Amino acid sequence: MNFENLLIELGTEELPPKALRKLAESFLANFTEELTKADLAFKSAVWYAAPRRLAINVTELAIAQADKIVEKRGPAVSSAFDAEGKPTKAAEGWARGNGITVDQAERLVTDKGEWLVYNAKVEGVETKSLIAAMAQRALDKLPIPKPMRWGSSKTQFIRPVHTATMLLGSELIEGELLGIKSARNVRGHRFMGTGFELDHADNYLTLLKEKGKVIADYESRKALIKADAEKAAAKIGGTADIEDDLLEEVTSLVEWPVVLTASFEEKFLNVPSEALVYTMKGDQKYFPVFDEAGKLLPNFIFVANIESKDPAQIIAGNEKVVRPRLADAEFFFNTDKKHTLESRLPSLETVLFQQQLGTLKDKVTRISALAAFIAEQTGANAVDAARAGLLSKTDLMTNMVMEFTDTQGTMGMHYARLDGETEAVALAMEEQYKPKFSGDTVPTAAVSCAVALADKLDTLVGIFGIGQAPKGAADPFALRRAAIGVLRIIVENKLPLDLVTLIAKAQELHGTNLSNANASDEVLEFLMARFRAWYQDKGIDVDVILAVLARRPTRPADFDSRINAVSHFRSLEASSALAAANKRVSNILAKVEGELPTAINSALLAEAAEQALAAKLAELQPQLAPLFANADYQQALTLLSSLRESVDQFFEDVMVMADDEALKNNRLALLNNLREQFLHVADISLLQ
């Protein structure tokens, strides 16, 4: 079979930068799915993307589908011929439909009878006749929330389309994509490059770079920007702050990246660096530069989309653009400093948190009380926790945060320090929102933990309390993130906190605001469900999670200890046998009517195997008790694993459901005792 390389390019107007990668990846995934469905073999496929184009390149694509034999089964032989052996109308109609005579049909014998069959050879279709339709279907399935029309066309896409190119090797594939006829012309850079005729699919990247002045390979462009930005920062003795999200966005904004260095007035460094960084990165898409000590330098790196004969002019232009934004930050900072955070408390009464749950002033009052309650249980400074909780949302009323919203918490920390608040209070102002996203760190300072937990629990209990729990994918109050945050803060800091107690206190502080009588139970169930999701994301086996969930431990740190213990137990040689034995014990005990017997009478231990098991349990129990008390579940399960031989022998030699009622009840008591030891940790009968 012959193969050729395929190139498909869609030339558009500027595509949304934050959607560019997803569009390109989806285009490729959709198209390769089409190739697979069409039984077209290929070696590999990659996507390219730049601000004004999407492209895919498929290497060693078969130029035609492989021929194949298709079995076309006809009527059963018993109904294909009459009593005289002549073909029936059914047989003749089937044969005629397949272009053969009945005599040309073969016979297929199965265990259900004998059938007429025709093995038809189906010739593969040429790839070039399939490409346009497959590419169009791939484009139709792209994730485009708001498609648009342009000109007089009824075609819809995320942005207007101007060119379409489909080449299989050197051959132009005829057809249309989004109403645009396939042609060889490829557009270059808007200002620097020239358009050209693409002669062969293999020459796309090279010609586009040389003639068009466009680096179409997204990953190459991204790597070039990162490397050049790092070099530029190093030249001025600093390190560029290159977050991947910003790097992705900048990569999606330029076709021909040129990295340049600019500066701003040093006086702006008197403003907290977070505010300056926010405007440089968020508004201007610049890379800030820091020195070795982590201090912001009066410089920034930016990426132009053109090679200028006068780069100094481009640098001056960017410096001119950023200066007013930095001046705004300076003005807001100096204005905000004139008022303490405490003085802003009354203004929180003007901001509604939620109609039924009150204002932000109501919320910080609850947070303050709950944070102090949590601090008392964890050994943190309750006075600082209460103070931090009370001030926690006051920075939302500052000019800086109103203008640069992502600086909430961070600016609160800076203003708290200027107000003379304790460092614990100031730090809690910033860390109250952690973790902000998946993979973010959690607060570790004791007061910060108390405030962060109080804020999240107040929201969880409040929203559930008014009957607005998340439904489906909708989660307007980010309750799933809040729940994971609660669990992570407690687990990762090993805090001795019980969810039931925390929920009850939060509910108490809401007073009569809550209308849902089942709120506390629903919040607990919601948090327990987050346990499963979180541990699954961490790679913990589902059966391990279910084994622990069966015991419903409501102390997250304790839950985590059990998860780790059961995961370790799974690695022991005896685990599978003991899990199976526990499952057998569970099934036996489940069939017992009435109360389970608990007292073991040593005089009724008739068989050697049951005597040995009882003796082993009696030997282990004094050792297990302190381990359970100290939540040393891993060591407890390791000790219990030594029961394997005794348990195996018991089930080999002993009939549990003996005719003698006393013997039976004694053996049930022995098994109940055995199972209870494991249940101190988890229900290991659920392990697979």
Curated annotation (Swiss-Prot):
Record flagged with keyword Transmembrane: no
> Which InterPro entries does the protein's record reference?
DALR_anticod-bd, Gly-tRNA-synth_bsu, Gly-tRNA-synth_heterodimer
Single GO term (MF):
glycine-tRNA ligase activity
Keywords in alphabetical order: Aminoacyl-tRNA synthetase, ATP-binding, Cytoplasm, Ligase, Nucleotide-binding, Protein biosynthesis
Catalysed reaction(s) here are: tRNA(Gly) + glycine + ATP = glycyl-tRNA(Gly) + AMP + diphosphate
EC number(s): the record gives 6.1.1.14
Assembly notes:
Tetramer of two alpha and two beta subunits.
Protein name per Swiss-Prot or TrEMBL? Glycine--tRNA ligase beta subunit
Q: Which organism is it from?
A: Shewanella sp. (strain MR-4)
Its lineage reads: Bacteria, Pseudomonadati, Pseudomonadota, Gammaproteobacteria, Alteromonadales
